[in-house]
């Protein structure tokens, strides 16, 4: 069985890389969490806003908590998991799971095989990575989608 030494469990969906998320392969789609108001005023969301813009495009999609907004940039998708109503709120694991399910559907419909993300929901949003990673594993277990998580 092939696997990297950093994988905790056999057959893990998630590979961990220490480095800059934005240096991931151009073929990877990117993922992060935002609120319905698309403020993106703190944390890694600020970098997504600067790099990819499209705030009005995201707002026009009128996505609610538990859904996913999507931008297409340079031949790849940028996924915005909508995990809370307002920027000042905190997300729930349930909304995170629903938005991951919505993203999975989009990935499968559009042939996306590689996702790169930070430890979503675990910075300013204060979710626990052991819970978040378990949800990611469950949501993507019956797919061939590869997930790389970047940490600094």
From Swiss-Prot:
Top enzyme class: hydrolase
EC number of the protein: 3.5.1.-, 3.2.2.-
GO BP term (any one): purine nucleoside metabolic process
Residue positions binding substrate: 21, 119-125, 152
Catalytic activity: 2''-O-acetyl-ADP-D-ribose + H2O = ADP-D-ribose + acetate + H(+); 5-O-(ADP-D-ribosyl)-L-glutamyl-[protein] + H2O = L-glutamyl-[protein] + ADP-D-ribose + H(+); alpha-NAD(+) + H2O = ADP-D-ribose + nicotinamide + H(+)
Regulation affecting activity: Subject to competitive inhibition by the product ADP-ribose.
Domain Macro: 2-152
Active-site residues (renumbered): 84 (nucleophile), 125 (proton acceptor)
Subcellular location field: Nucleus, Nucleoplasm; Nucleus, Nucleolus; Chromosome
Main location class: nucleus
Domain of life of the native organism: Eukaryota
UniProt cross-references to PROSITE patterns, sorted A to Z: MACRO
Alphabetical keyword list: Acetylation, Chromosome, Hydrolase, Nucleus, Phosphoprotein
GO annotations of cellular component type: nucleolus; nucleoplasm; site of DNA damage
InterPro entries: ADP-ribose_metab_enzymes (IPR050892), Macro_dom (IPR002589), Macro_dom-like (IPR043472)
Modified residues (N-acetylalanine): 2
Entry-annotated residues carrying Phosphoserine: 4
GO MF, one annotated term: purine nucleoside binding
Function: ADP-ribose glycohydrolase that hydrolyzes ADP-ribose and acts on different substrates, such as proteins ADP-ribosylated on glutamate and O-acetyl-ADP-D-ribose. Specifically acts as a glutamate mono-ADP-ribosylhydrolase by mediating the removal of mono-ADP-ribose attached to glutamate residues on proteins. Does not act on poly-ADP-ribosylated proteins: the poly-ADP-ribose chain of poly-ADP-ribosylated glutamate residues must by hydrolyzed into mono-ADP-ribosylated glutamate by PARG to become a substrate for OARD1.
Listed name of the protein: ADP-ribose glycohydrolase OARD1
Species: Bos taurus
Lineage: Eukaryota, Metazoa, Chordata, Craniata, Vertebrata
